[in-house]
Amino acid sequence: MALGRALGDAIRASEFGGRVLVAASGGLSHWLPSNDPRDPSVDATKKASLVHGRRDARAFAAAREPRVRAMGGNSEARVNPDWDGWFLEQLVAADAEPVAALGHDGLEEEAGSGGHEIRCWLVGHAAVGLPLVWTSYEAVPEWITGMGIGTTFSVSVYAPTS
């Protein structure tokens, strides 16, 4: 949060203060398989790539894709739509402190190992210093994440007439 506030202060103090777009992105809740080389559930090939890097990124990506696709809908690769909704509500209320108060372990418990990506949202929110006024959210288990968007300005949503 301090990083976001400092970024916002620097932007507002600059000659471009009112003409800067702050964009923050990251996944919402999602539980991914471990990437910790100390974790016994991590297989030897993955452990070696984590410790020593990947010599052949294309081969690694080709081998990884079927595993990722298999995770879609897998109960261990879940999302938490209730938590995602609560998180977005905090940003609408311009009160991210309850989220920050969760700390590392609390955040991981509620939003999963991939939930730490919401820190980007927190930095952007603190930099702008305004509540979100429009949000949209969809849990997408096939992509192993909750997908959300929010803005600090109103958005007209196109609705087909027929």
List each language-model region with its residue ranges.
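Beta-strand elements within well-structured catalytic alpha/beta cores of enzymes
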Residues: 18-28, 124
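Flexible, D/E/H-enriched segments
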Residues: 1-6, 13, 35-162
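Nuclease catalytic cores that cleave nucleic-acid phosphodiester bonds
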Residues: 11-18
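Conserved catalytic-core segments centered on acid/base and nucleophilic motifs
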Residues: 10-11, 23
